[in-house]
Amino acid sequence: MTLVYMNMALAFTISLLGLLMYRSHLMSSLLCLEGMMLSLFVTMAVTILNSHLILANMIPIILLVFAACEAALGLSLLVMVSNTYGVDHVQNLNLLQC
């Protein structure tokens, strides 16, 4: 395993542990999810560049599109929870029912 892959696996693991440990605030959960998506993007881009797959060059860009959609939905949910309850605790997400 090269140094780049080991660093990206470590970054993904640290982000996953952060997501599992700091679940009380929505903002910290969103930051950990973004760290996971960024490490996946770099890993996929390096893998595709090393294997010289021309047709697979679009896959990391599609992952970035999904990451941007996830960030936009997460931030809009954060704004809605903050405006409704005044805090960004994940516990309040169960109370947001129609």
From Swiss-Prot:
<keyword id="KW-0999">Mitochondrion inner membrane</keyword>
<comment type="function">
    <text>Core subunit of the mitochondrial membrane respiratory chain NADH dehydrogenase (Complex I) which catalyzes electron transfer from NADH through the respiratory chain, using ubiquinone as an electron acceptor. Part of the enzyme membrane arm which is embedded in the lipid bilayer and involved in proton translocation.</text>
</comment>
<keyword id="KW-1133">Transmembrane helix</keyword>
<comment type="subunit">
    <text>Core subunit of respiratory chain NADH dehydrogenase (Complex I) which is composed of 45 different subunits.</text>
</comment>
<dbReference type="Pfam" id="PF00420">
    <property type="entry name" value="Oxidored_q2"/>
</dbReference>
<keyword id="KW-0812">Transmembrane</keyword>
<keyword id="KW-0520">NAD</keyword>
<dbReference type="GO" id="GO:0008137">
    <property type="term" value="F:NADH dehydrogenase (ubiquinone) activity"/>
</dbReference>
<dbReference type="GO" id="GO:0042773">
    <property type="term" value="P:ATP synthesis coupled electron transport"/>
</dbReference>
<keyword id="KW-0679">Respiratory chain</keyword>
<keyword id="KW-1278">Translocase</keyword>
<feature type="transmembrane region" description="Helical">
    <location>
        <begin position="1"/>
        <end position="21"/>
    </location>
</feature>
<keyword id="KW-0813">Transport</keyword>
<dbReference type="GO" id="GO:0045271">
    <property type="term" value="C:respiratory chain complex I"/>
</dbReference>
<keyword id="KW-0496">Mitochondrion</keyword>
<comment type="similarity">
    <text>Belongs to the complex I subunit 4L family.</text>
</comment>
<keyword id="KW-0830">Ubiquinone</keyword>
<keyword id="KW-0472">Membrane</keyword>
<feature type="transmembrane region" description="Helical">
    <location>
        <begin position="29"/>
        <end position="49"/>
    </location>
</feature>
<keyword id="KW-0249">Electron transport</keyword>
<dbReference type="InterPro" id="IPR001133">
    <property type="entry name" value="NADH_UbQ_OxRdtase_chain4L/K"/>
</dbReference>
<dbReference type="InterPro" id="IPR039428">
    <property type="entry name" value="NUOK/Mnh_C1-like"/>
</dbReference>
<dbReference type="GO" id="GO:0005743">
    <property type="term" value="C:mitochondrial inner membrane"/>
</dbReference>
<feature type="transmembrane region" description="Helical">
    <location>
        <begin position="61"/>
        <end position="81"/>
    </location>
</feature>
<protein>
    <recommendedName>
        <fullName>NADH-ubiquinone oxidoreductase chain 4L</fullName>
        <ecNumber>7.1.1.2</ecNumber>
    </recommendedName>
</protein>
